[in-house]
Regions:
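Vicinal oxygen chelate
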Residues: 1-2, 43-44, 89-140
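N-terminal beta-strand motif that seeds the catalytic metal site of vicinal oxygen chelate
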Residues: 1-18, 73-82, 130-140
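A cross-kingdom feature marking solvent-exposed beta-strand/loop segments within repeated
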Residues: 5-7, 26-32, 36-39, 59-76, ...
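Short, structured motif recognition centered on aromatic/hydrophobic residues
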Residues: 6, 13, 20-23, 45, ...
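A structural feature that tracks compact, well-ordered secondary-structure segments
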Residues: 10-14, 53-56, 66, 79-83, ...
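The feature marks the first
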Residues: 17, 29-30, 49
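Hydrophobic side chains in well-ordered alpha-helices
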Residues: 19-22, 88-92
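Short, charged/polar surface micro-motifs in flexible loops or helix N-caps
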Residues: 48-52, 59-61, 85
Length: 140
């Protein structure tokens, strides 16, 4: 599998607006875009060739809401950009690595994403993302 870079670090937050304001006012990170995916509202803030992704759950059934309620706000996952997510998932399956997503699904900015089960990674949630050409990072 070819990992191109750390695409983003995701942080689960209680208030997206408060967190965006903090990142902007404290670190000078601009908001590139906000997006709603299912029961999660997210914001992408560029840092060099990577992003900070802020995630706020939008209801009690949201995985982010459950995470924040159980563990509090904080680091949620790391995302690696890969060239070919289908090949990456096939390679992981061949190595016996347990996946949360057997097939890619659509995530932030239209990226094809999949998560590895944290039980296989030392309890770190890892996302793989294949970015479309029109994606924010692909046009940078």
């Amino acid at each position: 599998m070819k990992v191109k870079r750390v695409e983003h670090i995701a942080i689960a937050v209680s208030s997206l607006k408060t967190s965006i304001d903090f990142m902007r006012d404290t670190f000078g990170l601009p908001l590139e875009y906000e997006e709603q995916i299912g029961q999660t509202r997210l914001a992408m803030l560029p840092v060099g060739e990577s992003y900070v992704e802020l995630l706020e759950g939008q209801g009690p059934e949201s995985g982010v809401t459950r995470w924040v309620n159980e563990k509090g706000p904080g680091l949620f996952h790391i995302c690696f950009e890969v060239e070919d997510i289908d090949a990456a998932l096939a390679e992981l399956r061949a190595k016996g690595i347990k996946l949360r997503d057997d097939r890619p699904r659509i995530g932030h900015g239209g990226a094809r994403i999949a998560f590895i089960d944290p039980a296989a990674t030392g309890n770190v949630l890892i996302e793989l993302a294949e970015l479309p050409q029109r994606h924010h990072a692909a046009t940078s």
